[in-house]
Amino acid sequence: MRLTIVAVGQKVPDWAQTAYDDYAKRFPPELKVELKAVKTEPRGSKTLENLLAAERTRIEGAIARGCRIVALDERGTAVTTMALAEHLKNWQLSGDDVAIVIGGPDGLDAGFKQSAHQRIRLSDLTLPHAMVRVLLIEQLYRAWSITINHPYHRE
């Protein structure tokens, strides 16, 4: 199974990239995790709707055909670590590749969110973009460790 994290925004602080890379390299070959960063649309004089539509086009271009799409959304379904582990297990059993999408500073296009297979939220808090990348990859690693009874996660 291939798990692709599509993130709007290319530049993150070094600490965030280091943390992301540390978790990403822990995944086994049968669960390949890839990060695809897509360019944030410059604001200029564009309406928010046009800006998000342009980012949507880039996001969709980064997602392989046939992928299950999971959008991170502040109004999405709250998930616990155990629920995320269950989702991950089900994704693996389905054999589908999965793309988890992190929106930019203005979020994700409404139509894109509606077309996603799932919408989840990581927290009720507003988090900086770089922190979301790190939090997501850590939680995915934790979820994977739960599915194989690895001692990383403790109840």
From Swiss-Prot:
It catalyses: pseudouridine(1915) in 23S rRNA + S-adenosyl-L-methionine = N(3)-methylpseudouridine(1915) in 23S rRNA + S-adenosyl-L-homocysteine + H(+). It is found in: Cytoplasm. SUPFAM superfamilies: alpha/beta knot. One of its GO terms (cellular component) is cytoplasm. It comes from the Bacteria. Belongs to the RNA methyltransferase RlmH family. Specifically methylates the pseudouridine at position 1915 (m3Psi1915) in 23S rRNA. This is Ribosomal RNA large subunit methyltransferase H. It comes from Polaromonas naphthalenivorans (strain CJ2). The gene is rlmH.
